[in-house]
Regions:
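Bacterial Sec-dependent signal peptides at the C-terminal "C-region" and cleavage site
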Residues: 14-23
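Bacterial N-terminal signal peptides
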Residues: 7-15
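Acidic/His/Gly-enriched intrinsically disordered linker/tail segments
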Residues: 119, 140-209, 215, 221-222, ...
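Surface-exposed patches in mature extracellular/periplasmic domains of secreted proteins
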Residues: 66-79, 135-142, 160-168, 225-231, ...
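Positively charged n-region of N-terminal signal peptides that target proteins for export
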Residues: 1-4
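Juxtacatalytic substrate-recognition/specificity segment
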Residues: 25-141
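Soluble non-cytosolic domains of exported or imported proteins
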Residues: 46-58, 115-120, 124, 139-143, ...
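Beta/coil-rich, acidic/histidine-enriched accessory regions frequently appended to metallopeptidases
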Residues: 6, 20, 240-317
Length: 317
């Protein structure tokens, strides 16, 4: 609660410098390693501006935990207020997307009628901010960009204290199960080719399974010295923000080059062109994520319980 109040008070200071322009309300907020430009496409009172800025700061800062600083030094966030049931949802943030056209811009469509606490409990903004941890990935390998963002949306929500450990693993398990049951006839690359409308769950959660497998393998073999966080931090130092789109193999080869022992292309060769879904169940079992009637129970005496705790630990790397 103290952290929440501090963020809101800091946000109010930034909000006082907000300016009304033809594009809406424009302000800035500092996050680790970056200055975030914020455009709110509506005329709203300063208190609400302050609340929204605080939420955006907290969300972007949670992504900064991956490497210690935000992956883009000057991101632009555009907030678009919409109706209560836009996109057929009453969610506080029913839709978001990232565009890259001369700048990296995160667009978030929000329901202003919801209290600010509901925004903190919603994963959409965390998912969209997490996209900036990677270069833009070409559509034929979209499962990587959407999957890594889907993995991190749950991990980072737990690290920020917006999910409990059990909630984060419950949501991860449910997503992975949706992916496993979606289009078992397709490989991950084929699912990306089929498109979001025909293979959405496989695209989003097949890549999340790869992220989980890589993260656990890196942590286990290095006794916690390496992780998906650390290798993405190295990618950020050398290559982000990136001007051009990357293929999936190019990304995975680059990530492997940042490790003493490669892992990503091995996972790519194993799963990208093979029908079915990455085998994540044995990893969950070793982590102590026990599934009982579709409900997650966490075992602290499991072989890799400390790795599980490190993945979703508060502000942990």
């Amino acid at each position: 609660m103290q952290k929440f109040l501090l963020i809101c008070m800091t946000a109010l200071l930034f909000a006082t410098a907000a300016a009304a322009t033809r594009d809406g309300i424009v302000t800035e907020a500092e996050i680790p390693g970056a200055t975030m430009r914020i455009t709110i496409r509506d005329s709203i009172d300063n208190n609400k501006v302050g609340e929204l800025v605080g939420w955006l700061q907290a969300t972007a800062s949670s992504v900064s935990v991956v490497s210690g600083r935000f992956p883009n030094p000057s991101p632009h966030v555009v907030v678009v207020p919409v109706g209560r049931t836009s996109w057929g949802s009453s969610s506080p943030v029913p839709f978001g997307r990232v565009t890259r056209n001369g700048e990296e811009r995160i667009e978030l469509y929000i329901n202003l009628d919801r209290p600010i606490e509901d925004y903190y409990g919603n994963w959409t903004a965390t998912h969209e901010f997490s996209h900036l941890l990677l270069p833009h990935i070409r559509d034929r390998h979209k499962w990587i960009s959407e999957g890594f963002a889907s993995y991190y949306q749950n991990v980072l929500m737990a690290r920020a204290g917006n999910y409990s450990h059990a909630e984060a693993w419950q949501y991860l398990y449910e997503g992975l199960e949706r992916g496993r049951q979606s289009r078992p006839d397709l490989s991950l690359n084929e699912a990306a080719g089929a498109g979001i409308r025909r293979a959405r769950m496989k695209i989003y959660w097949g890549g999340a399974a790869i992220a989980l497998l890589a993260d656990v393998a890196l942590r286990e073999r290095s006794n916690g010295a390496e992780s998906l966080d650390t290798v993405l931090g190295r990618l950020q130092q050398c290559c982000l923000p990136a001007d051009a789109s990357w293929s999936g193999p190019r990304l995975f080869r680059k990530l492997d080059s940042l490790l003493e022992e490669p892992i990503f292309m091995r996972l790519y060769r194993q799963y990208a062109t093979t029908p079915g879904f990455p085998g994540y169940q044995p990893v969950l079992q070793k982590l102590g994520v026990v599934i009982d009637r579709k409900k997650v129970r966490l075992r602290d005496d499991a072989e890799l319980a400390t790795i599980r705790e490190a993945i979703t630990g508060s502000l942990s790397r």
